[in-house]
């Protein structure tokens, strides 16, 4: 059961009467609870941008105890050089992932000043262990397995073909439902993700607000030791407290975790000729200070009909102002016949040439242009800042050092 509607002002209570009816912070909260506000923006942001929620908890967060440096870190140093070369990886695995929970199975791929990308792998649930990211919100893009995200606001269920966003500072734990779970994770430290402007598309299309789902209140009232791991200023810290941090009995507000089924995306594409720019596939965006230039765009290439006439239908050859990191959830990406599989990653930074590989080009340039259904789901994290690759990703055996060879079959066919 979920609450519906992107950015709506929701309210939910797990126990009847837990929400105060007429105010935020009464002298004595109902049921002996404590009122606590969680702000996602500055108090004075314009009303339509202002994010906050009021939580009614068994104990306030100040009782969590003292944080100490954690021996493990998820962020890794970047390579010194900014290579102009295109890069690609097969799915990445480490020996540390033989038995691991969500935090232990994170692999830092690349980052920019306000965005970082990881892959996650987990085959072990977090029982009395919790995670929070003070540095930014987290966007989950699973490609295998099923997980449940237990948050301060309630539970989200997540599997391949859906996404979830955990706001900055919200504590959660990951329960692995399948044998193992794999996915991509994007950390956004810029403006919170929101729906893109539709412009001439009109009032409807792309990701519809009513399809975004928010959790109903649910809480843990358990004693014993509970470990909280917190990412703060690029480092991990931990504390051990005598109660669960997921002790919110009721809440109201517009700053909360949410999930979305990508199959509900209303895809816009050409019904005449040419290949529209990939911005028409934007699901969520983090706006920068420059209008029309995003800090982060989350873009998908979903299942769709391809019907363009007298047109090269796959993505065109391109040198881009923006910086692209791509992944694949399922299927076969229409611009890459080989080498790019679910769990894989490619990075094409500013002005790095990219486009269909030779085999894909040959097929698309000569095929009979009948309506064709593409049954795959690829995605892109696009940023205004350069993707800097981590040392561990650059030196990982999964990096395809021969990636550029996929374009070496092209011949000169020019004739006057």
Curated annotation (Swiss-Prot):
Binding site for homogentisate: 333, 354
Xref: Gene3D superfamilies: Jelly Rolls
Coiled coil (UniProt feature): none
Top enzyme class: oxidoreductase
Catalytic activity, EC: 1.13.11.5
Binding site residues for Fe cation: 318, 324, 354
Active site (record annotation): 275
Record's keyword terms, sorted: Dioxygenase, Iron, Metal-binding, Oxidoreductase, Phenylalanine catabolism, Tyrosine catabolism
CC cofactor: Fe cation
GO terms (BP aspect): L-phenylalanine catabolic process; tyrosine catabolic process
Any GO CC annotation of this UniProt entry: cytoplasm
InterPro entries found in the cross-reference section: HgmA_C, HgmA_N, Homogentis_dOase, Homogentis_dOase_bac, RmlC-like_jellyroll, RmlC_Cupin_sf
Pfam families: HgmA_C, HgmA_N
Pathway(s) per entry: Amino-acid degradation; L-phenylalanine degradation; acetoacetate and fumarate from L-phenylalanine: step 4/6
Residues making up the signal peptide according to the UniProt record: none
Keyword Phosphoprotein attributed: no
Gene Ontology molecular function terms on file: homogentisate 1,2-dioxygenase activity; iron ion binding
UniProt keyword Oxidoreductase, yes or no: yes
Catalytically driven reaction(s): homogentisate + O2 = 4-maleylacetoacetate + H(+)
Entry function: Involved in the catabolism of homogentisate (2,5-dihydroxyphenylacetate or 2,5-OH-PhAc), a central intermediate in the degradation of phenylalanine and tyrosine. Catalyzes the oxidative ring cleavage of the aromatic ring of homogentisate to yield maleylacetoacetate.
Subunit structure and binding partners: Hexamer; dimer of trimers.
Family stated for the protein in its record: Belongs to the homogentisate dioxygenase family.
Protein's name in the database: Homogentisate 1,2-dioxygenase
Organism of derivation: Legionella pneumophila (strain Corby)
């Amino acid at each position: 059961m979920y609450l519906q509607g992107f950015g709506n002002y929701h309210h939910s209570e797990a126990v009847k009467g837990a929400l105060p009816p007429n105010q935020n912070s009464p002298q004595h909260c109902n049921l002996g609870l404590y009122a606590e506000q969680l702000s996602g923006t500055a108090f004075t942001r314009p009303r339509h941008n202002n994010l906050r929620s009021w939580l009614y908890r068994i104990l306030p967060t100040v009782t969590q105890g003292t944080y100490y440096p954690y021996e493990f870190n998820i962020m890794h140093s970047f390579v010194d050089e900014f290579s102009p070369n295109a890069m690609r990886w097969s799915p990445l695995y480490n020996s540390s992932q033989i038995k691991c929970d969500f935090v232990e199975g994170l692999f830092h791929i690349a980052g920019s000043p306000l965005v970082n990308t990881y892959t996650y792998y987990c085959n072990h649930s977090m029982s009395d262990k919790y995670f929070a990211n003070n540095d930014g919100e987290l966007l989950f893009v699973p490609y295998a397995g099923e997980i449940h995200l237990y948050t301060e606001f309630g539970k989200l269920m997540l599997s391949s073909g859906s996404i979830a966003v955990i706001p900055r500072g919200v504590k959660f734990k990951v329960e692995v439902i399948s044998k193992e779970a794999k996915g991509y994770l994007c950390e956004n430290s810029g403006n919170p993700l929101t729906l893109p402007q539709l412009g001439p598309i009109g009032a409807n299309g792309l990701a519809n607000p009513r399809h975004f789902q928010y959790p109903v209140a649910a809480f843990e009232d358990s004693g014993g030791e509970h470990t909280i791991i917190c990412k703060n200023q690029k480092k991990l810290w931990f504390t051990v407290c005598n109660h669960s941090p997921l002790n919110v009995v009721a809440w109201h507000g517009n700053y909360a975790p949410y999930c979305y089924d990508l199959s509900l995306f209303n895809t816009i594409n050409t019904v005449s000729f040419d290949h529209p720019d990939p911005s028409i596939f934007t699901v969520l965006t983090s706006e920068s200070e420059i209008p029309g230039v995003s800090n982060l765009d989350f873009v998908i290439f979903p299942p769709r009909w391809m019907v363009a006439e007298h047109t090269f239908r796959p993505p065109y050859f391109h040198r881009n102002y923006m910086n692209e990191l791509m992944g694949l959830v399922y299927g076969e990406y229409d611009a890459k016949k080989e080498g790019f599989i679910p769990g894989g990653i490619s990075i094409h930074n500013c002005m790095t040439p990219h486009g269909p590989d030779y085999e894909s080009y040959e097929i698309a340039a000569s095929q009979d242009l009948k309506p064709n259904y593409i049954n795959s789901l690829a995605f892109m994290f696009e940023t205004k800042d350069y993707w800097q690759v981590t040392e561990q990703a650059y030196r990982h055996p999964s990096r395809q050092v021969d990636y550029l060879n996929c374009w070496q079959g092209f011949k000169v066919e020019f004739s006057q």
